[in-house]
């Protein structure tokens, strides 16, 4: 039973990260509606996917160092919430902006928390191996 829980805690943040990164990449497809030409479209895709590239690199690092994923995904969620709050203060507040926070920042927070739980569990297991009872 413990082994199944360990596998679940290990794989869940990684799989959710991949799904979340692909979800964010879908938002860049709106650049094709702009009729920018070939190079303009390439530049637009690159600009829209900068967060995707950053999170993909973070996932790659986090595969072995879970604390990095825990911190960065949590900070990414906080950054998105902060950007949305600034936008809400600048523009007129609209209720749909709050739902965007749940849709984008919520999974980032969840992934960050799962990476931290995985890191803590891994640390606990390493200490148990070093100092047997």
Where are these regions (language model features)?
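Membrane-water interface at the C-terminal end of transmembrane alpha helices
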Residues: 107-132
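Juxtamembrane helix-break-helix junctions at the cytosolic face
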Residues: 55-69
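Membrane-helix boundary connector in multi-pass membrane proteins
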Residues: 82-101
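Aromatic-anchored segments of alpha-helical transmembrane domains
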Residues: 20-27, 76-87
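Alpha-helical transmembrane segments of polytopic membrane proteins
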Residues: 42-52, 98-106
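Short juxtamembrane and helix-loop transition motifs at transmembrane-helix boundaries
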Residues: 27-40
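Cytosolic juxtamembrane helix and N-cap/initiation of the first transmembrane helix
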Residues: 1-21
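Hydrophobic cores of alpha-helical transmembrane segments in multi-pass inner/ER membrane proteins
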Residues: 51-59, 106-115
């Amino acid at each position: 039973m413990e082994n199944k829980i360990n596998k679940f805690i290990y794989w869940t943040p990684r799989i959710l990260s991949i799904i979340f990164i692909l979800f964010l990449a879908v938002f860049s497809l709106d650049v094709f509606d702009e009729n920018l030409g070939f190079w303009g479209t390439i530049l637009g895709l690159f600009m829209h996917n900068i967060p995707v590239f950053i999170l993909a690199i973070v996932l790659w690092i986090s595969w072995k160092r879970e604390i990095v994923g825990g911190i960065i995904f949590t900070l990414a969620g906080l950054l998105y919430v902060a950007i949305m709050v600034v936008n809400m203060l600048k523009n007129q507040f609209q209720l749909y902006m709050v739902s965007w926070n749940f849709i984008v920042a919520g999974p980032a927070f969840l992934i960050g928390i799962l990476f931290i739980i995985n890191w803590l569990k891994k640390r606990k297991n390493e200490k148990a191996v070093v100092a047997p009872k």
